[in-house]
């Protein structure tokens, strides 16, 4: 017999936009959220799940992710990409934007075609091009030989190849063509992100005024904050038009830097990301990031040549746990950084990012230690809680 279209999740602490409801009840009608309330009587013809001792939070939204489960979004087959998506879904990421790394333009336009198909099918929420329009001075784990200036014609070529699936382009806006490309992206409804940049404070302000709205992994791959030359960090933190990405894995950021970002930008302007590469959810070993060899040791990815950090092996549930248990952030702020803020940035907050009636039934069940115990996506269990369910 088919499972009932209606599910009732009871007894958990449910994190809503208005606050946390203890001993809450969340009703799932098919693929959508039906409603929420303190636990009350029986719903007829519903599958009931007693989640006492758990949290229910919105599904996580990852703006910046290069792969996982041993698979790369830049170079893998369709099956590889689906493996990476499935790996992150099992860790609570119900909405994912696939990020590419620097490559030849011909390669990236072809890649855009493959990833756009998966976007059209609903497996991905879109494409983020990180490179090749970045600064050689702040290239990080990108091949310097393949970098190029952000000429608008090249940026437009990637957008055209994406068939509407491009969601974000990271670029060093101080390079020739940078500001014009920011304006092009803004005109076409694609997020212009400042990253891998050697820009000054003043140049970054110009980029924001031209339409840039995201800081790609703030603090990383950009000049440090200085008292005479504040650089891009100060400009990005102070402007209310900008959302700042943070990689909260304990490697990319000192806790004081994360605290500074939340204090200066505020909880509504922070988006936790993974910047994950193939090893996320898979393990240590040798990998490729684009054309560059990477060695992952104790969960930290570094280029074999030069030793630069090469993305992360983070999953967003780990970012949640660290934020709660190490950084001591309130759960409501963490949920905004993992779900509501990136959903709003993508223009998808009418469907995802919070637990409200009519929105997609995307949610994560966490235990008291914030370990994932269940993942629901569009009303179907990706990971079913190990508790008794009674129809």
Residue ranges and their predicted role:
Residues 51-107:
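Metal-associated gating/positioning segment near the N- to mid-region
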Residues 129, 185, 215, 323, ...:
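Conserved, mostly hydrophobic/aromatic
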Residues 234-244, 262-274, 280-366:
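His/Asp/Glu-enriched, well-ordered alpha-helical/loop segment
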Residues 77-80, 111-114, 151-153, 228-233:
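Charged helix-capping and loop-helix junction motifs
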């Amino acid at each position: 017999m088919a499972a009932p279209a209606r599910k009732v999740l009871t007894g958990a602490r449910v994190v809503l936009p208005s606050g946390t409801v203890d001993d809450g009840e969340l009703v799932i009608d098919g693929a959508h959220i039906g409603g929420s309330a303190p636990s009350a009587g029986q719903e007829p013809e519903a599958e009931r799940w007693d989640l006492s001792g758990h949290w229910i939070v919105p599904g996580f939204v990852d703006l910046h992710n290069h792969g996982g489960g041993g698979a790369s979004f830049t170079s893998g087959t369709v099956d590889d990409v689906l493996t990476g998506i499935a790996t992150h879904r099992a860790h609570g990421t119900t909405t994912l934007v696939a990020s590419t790394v620097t490559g030849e333009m011909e390669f990236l336009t072809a890649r855009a075609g493959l990833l756009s198909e998966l976007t059209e099918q609903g497996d991905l929420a879109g494409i983020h091009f990180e490179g090749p329009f970045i600064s050689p001075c702040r290239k990080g784990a990108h091949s310097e030989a393949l970098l190029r200036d952000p000429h608008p014609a090249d940026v437009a070529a990637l957008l055209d190849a994406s068939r509407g699936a491009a969601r974000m382009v990271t670029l060093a806006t101080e390079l020739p063509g940078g500001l014009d490309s920011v304006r092009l992206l803004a005109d076409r409804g694609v997020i212009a992100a400042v990253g891998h940049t050697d820009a000054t404070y003043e140049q970054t302000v110009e980029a924001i005024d031209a339409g840039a709205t995201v800081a790609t992994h703030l603090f990383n791959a950009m000049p440090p904050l200085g008292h005479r030359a504040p650089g891009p960090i100060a400009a990005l933190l102070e402007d209310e038009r900008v959302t700042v990405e943070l990689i909260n894995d304990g490697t990319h950021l000192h806790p004081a830097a994360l605290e500074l970002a939340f204090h200066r930008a505020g909880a509504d302007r922070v988006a936790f990301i993974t910047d994950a590469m193939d090893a996320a959810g898979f393990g240590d070993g040798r990998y490729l990031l684009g054309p560059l060899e990477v060695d992952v040791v104790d969960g930290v990815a570094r280029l074999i040549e030069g030793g630069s950090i090469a993305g992360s092996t983070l999953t967003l549930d780990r970012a949640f746990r660290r934020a709660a248990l190490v950084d001591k952030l309130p759960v409501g702020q963490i949920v905004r950084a993992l779900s509501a803020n990136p959903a709003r940035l993508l223009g998808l907050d009418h469907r995802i990012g919070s637990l409200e009636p009519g929105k997609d039934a995307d949610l994560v069940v966490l235990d008291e230690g914030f370990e994932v115990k269940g993942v629901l996506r569009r009303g179907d269990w990706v990971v079913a809680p190990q508790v008794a369910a009674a129809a």
